[in-house]
Amino acid sequence: MHPAAEHSPLGKSSEYIATYTPSLLFPIPRLAKWAELGVSGDALPWQGVDYWNCFELSWLLPSGKPVVAIGEFAIPCDSPNIIESKSFKLYLNSLNQTKFESVAQLQACLAKDLSAAAGKVVAVKVSTLADVEAQGVTTLPGQCIDALDVTIDNYEQPQPELLRCSTERVVEETVHSHLLKSNCPVTGQPDWGSVVVEYKGRALDHASLLTYLISFRQHADFHEQCVERIYLDLKKLLQPEYLTVYARYVRRGGLDINPYRSTRAISPENLRLVRQ
């Protein structure tokens, strides 16, 4: 468990405060987990973003009439802190009985508070239900590898030694899996996800990738660190010209978290999958 997470509200009984309370946000420094991976915060080997989507966003108009919407928050992957998810939910719930003059005022408030907690500017978008409904759901790009026949009996820790690739053949391809699962390091609750890998480099053995992803099944870590571990393990093996790892996790507590790590400075689309 991350030392800072022990002091967060995650896994503890909490009072639900219904009026604006930005102090509920609980930042957790990324540095300790980066150190575990052998990564320096001064020279990160990736670019990217963490997309958070909130499906339980509500506030009051000046008349007292409530509004519901869906919030999208883009936290830079190089921000000093992640925001602990339960504290994020409690903070958003504190808006439920708070009046805002306009959506613009709400967005400015959210951006100010979340940026302060993350330690870097967080982009905020508030959408109507109709706008999000019109977007529908999408599918991951590339070939799904989930039908491959693999055997595995160890799920406690990620096993990069399972990964295999060709040392003679270079390919450019995109593959994905819906079998990613890890556990919350604080509560032990399951985190279900889908992950897409896009790269140009040594040809990755698809069955070995699937087995490797399944090896995360009982691993306890936050979403962001799981994706960063996958990225680093693949980067070491494939020696790619470029590499992207993008995970879309199933929501818990009205929030889903979607980390994106890449060698390239390309902003991904934040489009929902069928399980989201």
UniProtKB/Swiss-Prot annotation:
Q: Pull one GO CC term from this UniProt entry.
A: cytoplasm
Name the Gene Ontology molecular function terms of this record: preQ1 synthase activity
Top-level class of the enzyme under EC nomenclature: oxidoreductase
Give compartment(s).
Answer: Cytoplasm
State which Enzyme Commission number(s) the record gives.
1.7.1.13
Which catalytic residues are annotated? Answer: 184, 191
Which stretch is the leader sequence? none
Q: What is its main location?
A: cytoplasm
Classification via InterPro entries? GTP-CH-I_C/QueF, NADPH_dep_7-cyano-7-deazaG_red, QueF, QueF_N, QueF_type2
One of its Pfam families is: QueF_N
Q: Which UniProt keywords apply?
A: Cytoplasm, NADP, Oxidoreductase, Queuosine biosynthesis
Kindly state which reaction or reactions the protein catalyses: 7-aminomethyl-7-carbaguanine + 2 NADP(+) = 7-cyano-7-deazaguanine + 2 NADPH + 3 H(+)
Extract the SUPFAM superfamilies matched here. Answer: Tetrahydrobiopterin biosynthesis enzymes-like
**What's the family?**
Belongs to the GTP cyclohydrolase I family. QueF type 2 subfamily.
> Self-association or partners: how does it assemble?
Homodimer.
What is this protein for, i.e. what is its function?
Catalyzes the NADPH-dependent reduction of 7-cyano-7-deazaguanine (preQ0) to 7-aminomethyl-7-deazaguanine (preQ1).
For this entry, the protein name equals NADPH-dependent 7-cyano-7-deazaguanine reductase
Protein species of origin: Pseudomonas entomophila (strain L48)
The gene name reads queF
